[in-house]
């Protein structure tokens, strides 16, 4: 994850917060920034097998986080992707609950709201994240 991406998405998340009035605890907001920065230039983020099979074959916290993050990214950035948005939300929530920490239990509980917020960050912000990449870092 590049620092420049983190800086861009920190600004985007701040703008979305101001526009929507949605305020998350700081650790959730940081998680959204990190998630977007981590996925921005990845083209191989989808599971190798189906989402359902990936859920059934979670081996550890890392694979649970990867699947949860993928579902959160897909539902926020590509809300019309695939079968049904609620399918990916359900799988993402289930993956995050397998980690059983306060952070991931919170992300799981508020998954649809966080996903909608990510959608605003990427598609509905007055500040277009793509324009921010034109900055000379």
Residue ranges and their predicted role:
Residues 1-137:
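Polar/charged low-complexity regulatory segments
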